[in-house]
Amino acid sequence: MVSEITHKSYPLHFVLFPFMAQGHMIPMVDIARLLAQRGVKITIVTTPHNAARFENVLSRAIESGLPISIVQVKLPSQEAGLPEGNETFDSLVSMELLVPFFKAVNMLEEPVQKLFEEMSPQPSCIISDFCLPYTSKIAKKFNIPKILFHGMCCFCLLCMHVLRKNREILENLKSDKEHFVVPYFPDRVEFTRPQVPMATYVPGEWHEIKEDIVEADKTSYGVIVNTYQELEPAYANDYKEARSGKAWTIGPVSLCNKVGADKAERGNKADIDQDECLKWLDSKEEGSVLYVCLGSICSLPLSQLKELGLGLEESQRPFIWVVRGWEKNKELLEWFSESGFEERVKDRGLLIKGWSPQMLILAHHSVGGFLTHCGWNSTLEGITSGIPLLTWPLFGDQFCNQKLVVQVLKVGVSAGVEEVTNWGEEEKIGVLVDKEGVKKAVEELMGESDDAKERRKRVKELGQLAQKAVEEGGSSHSNITSLLEDIMQLAQSNN
């Protein structure tokens, strides 16, 4: 076992740098625990507010004997022109704060450098979120290998890699509405330019930030991916080849959460009592409930949320609907009560205003479908739980994930969203799916057609394969061993 090697010879010390956004931090904290379980000393570097979000989960891990510590660094908000209190990506109230936020984040280079000068034992490896390009300079200065974590699947990472190598494909498009086929791909897949992460050119400082991110990607030692070989074998193999073998699939990392409290508080403390939620689910028939959650960042316009709600109502199926960013959705709260919606659906609709215990909900036998924004964490959690997906992508890697789920894996149904809803620009888009479209998509997913039955069967099989992948001898478990052996050899050769 690698844990024995690390104790007997050279003690491995990994320093983890999560990006300050829920969807990025959640899997990084899981990765910290997975590595610590193998005897690796872990130091997580983050800001005070972000450290507080994961205090309970990490405290339990540390109390259980895992060698994890957290080092807090203050975000230089004022120096970057960022108003105080904006320590997380999901707390930003406008697009105008995006560049100052990234500036502040990358100004952490100097205090982090001082940390590394004093760190003991000397770090053997950095694992950094791809949104933190300054960590490449730290890695170079201290001669430490840097492993990138993108938080995306191999399908998406390979797509981005292919398009970077074949820039003329995007350059030759006449408009953002025009579709193109991704070349050299295991499956025939079409996108428009805005549907691919980091493919749209934005001039000015944001372009410079993106270029720094791309450059840092090129200079990294390798990549870890929160996926498993059996889920997307062709894409995992091709991406590993593209990275000269230095790509390790180690997921689903969420499966390290075995304790009920860890599942319930994954990412944040839930805004509903866990027992109340489970009691409600217990009262519903097996496979009858649709779980609806569109992520921690997006706030769809009121007009679209109303159509979604009315579609859920007309589907006549029990549902749990999570509405996040609640402060921004006061108008929706008013509509819930004034229109009579909340009263009409009270017997079969559970509304969670804030953060939900998503892993616990998806694992419950009464849940039979998941309407998701297709963020990779949620997508993978749904598949891992054996739940078919109703896809409603918004931006970023989410359209890639939809293509994988619907076209390649055939475990999901599209809600019909083709247009990208850029973060902060939701009002410009308006209604993309009306209530009839919602009702129809829900029926297609949750109904008893042959296609629906086949989807359910297929996703259950993929869920079982996920469990096997993380067990000892499984593909992801073995890949963590391989990664640690690789870093161990590097560490020993450097000493």
From Swiss-Prot:
The EC code for this enzyme is 2.4.1.368
Cell cycle recorded as keyword: no
Per the record, the GO terms for biological process are: saponin metabolic process
Q: Where is the active site?
A: H24, D129
Q: Which GO terms describe its molecular function?
A: UDP-glucosyltransferase activity
Residues annotated for an anthocyanidin binding in this entry? H24, G396
What's the domain of life for this entry?
Eukaryota
Task: State the top-level EC class.
Answer: transferase
InterPro entries on file = UDP_glucos_trans (IPR002213), UDP_glycos_trans_CS (IPR035595)
Q: Which reaction does it catalyse?
A: oleanolate + UDP-alpha-D-glucose = oleanolate 3-O-beta-D-glucoside + UDP + H(+)
List, alphabetically, the PROSITE patterns matched: UDPGT
Query: What does the UniProt function comment say about this protein?
Result: The monoglucosylated hederagenin 3-O-beta-D-glucoside is a feeding deterrent of the yellow-striped flea beetle (Phyllotreta nemorum).
* Family label: Belongs to the UDP-glycosyltransferase family.
Protein name as it appears in the record = UDP-glycosyltransferase 73C11
What is the source species? Barbarea vulgaris (Yellow rocket)
